């Protein structure tokens, strides 16, 4: 048992009481009431003021836990209470572990937010932020009481998640995946499988070919860089897409979606606060969140909304120079093409100008090209890899040191297989040593999801003319694409017909990012509620119609402007009419 002379008991205890009495309390918050069950050195009749004062200074006292224990034990022994039972919260450090004479110990306090990596707490991801969280609450409310809200369902226009919004999976994809997941079917007679009308012959043959490449089972780890046969398919796809610019399988890394590739690259090139990454504003929040986790600086460059969200190379170079002056090394330049959330598509000239800056300052370029299949009529996608190769031939030596990482994913396009986590990155201009570093990082996760890798193969090598699935596969793809374009243009035209909204014409991707000139009264009420004005609008929209969007502040925007991001994935057009009605009522309510 713990022991100390009665004199020392009183001395320590009185000293603590003196500290508490002399502590000047200005404000008390609910955080001071974290552990109301803890007995204090005061008697049960102690005043509320003393109790609050004690809780305010408790962290200071606990740094001298031996004195605290003595004082606590003395007070409790006088009242006949247990000396140690409620002192477990003090055991935060090994050298303060409380033990009895028979070497028993009292369990330490659980870790709290104070123990969490600060970088994790700083990271924010608006796509699943406050508004989507509120949407989940309303969804739960509807399930309990369908009549309790002025709408009957939540429309998740906040995230590019096609199959959540009733986009059907491509039949060919799912036939092949089904056979890979249950390979016993592949041992049956092919004609019997075809006669079952569940599988077409080309899907059966493709599954057998993939199974051979994979090594016999999708349940086994693959190599960390990905299945070699699938990487060969990706290289062939890129070579064809880029009109003969050769791609090599050894430069391909299969990944668990494009997000995994972003994590790899930023983990490697972010070395702390002295390094910075150039990101477009508005941007996809994955980048700022990952930078926060890596304790590195975001170096924002603003896209020009008035010219269709174009990229200004002079703006990028200005940001680079300012970073260098502030002793921050710009290591990476992020380009999202087609844009998220803007939907803009870069011209070859704009891409060439970006490479001028990258070559001049030695920044790695991340080309986030996951929406390359989501291209609207009248627009053409040009990969950054293709433009770089052209520049290298036209200007020998000038662009030879440029390092480019190009990303693609099965989550977007007409595939929409977000939950399957398939993707790849192609490295251009990286040395063997740099590729080995990336491979080491990939190896920590062992390998990407093998069925996701198979989906990558299906994405880059769909059925071709003459195969049994070709016509039906083309029909499904065309239907998905046409419906997306119809909804996008309807929403775009609706926005531009409404008071206070201006929206750039979409060129690609699956989002619109309209600017909203909110009435002064709405801005004032938002501030009163401690919300950003665009968050206030999105919250009102959600609670009135069930349409969930993302405030523009989550993506970054020019100071003094307000935007929101919405997808146009939700089926039908009825929800667009509901939005139109809400907007008119909102402006009538808050009109200046």
Curated annotation (Swiss-Prot):
Its EC number is 2.6.1.2. Pathway: Amino-acid degradation; L-alanine degradation via transaminase pathway; pyruvate from L-alanine: step 1/1. GO terms for molecular function: L-alanine:2-oxoglutarate aminotransferase activity; pyridoxal phosphate binding. It is an enzyme of class 2 (transferase). Keywords: Aminotransferase, Mitochondrion, Phosphoprotein, Pyridoxal phosphate, Transferase, Transit peptide. GO terms for biological process: alanine biosynthetic process; alanine catabolic process; L-alanine catabolic process. It catalyses: L-alanine + 2-oxoglutarate = pyruvate + L-glutamate. Its main location: mitochondrion. The modification N6-(pyridoxal phosphate)lysine is found at residue 412. SUPFAM superfamilies: PLP-dependent transferases. It holds the Pfam family Aminotran_1_2. Residues 1-64 form a transit peptide. It comes from the Eukaryota. Induction: Induced by alanine. Pyridoxal 5'-phosphate binds at residues 258-259, 284, 340, 409, 421. Its cofactor is pyridoxal 5'-phosphate. Belongs to the class-I pyridoxal-phosphate-dependent aminotransferase family. Alanine aminotransferase subfamily. PANTHER family: ALANINE AMINOTRANSFERASE (PTHR11751), ALANINE TRANSAMINASE (PTHR11751:SF29). Homodimer. Present with 9960 molecules/cell in log phase SD medium. Alanine aminotransferase involved in both alanine biosynthesis and utilization. Under respiratory conditions, constitutes the sole pathway for alanine biosynthesis and catabolism. Under fermentative conditions, it plays a catabolic role and alanine is mainly synthesized through an alternative pathway. This is Alanine aminotransferase, mitochondrial. It comes from Saccharomyces cerevisiae (strain ATCC 204508 / S288c). The lineage of its organism: Eukaryota, Fungi, Dikarya, Ascomycota, Saccharomycotina. The gene is ALT1.
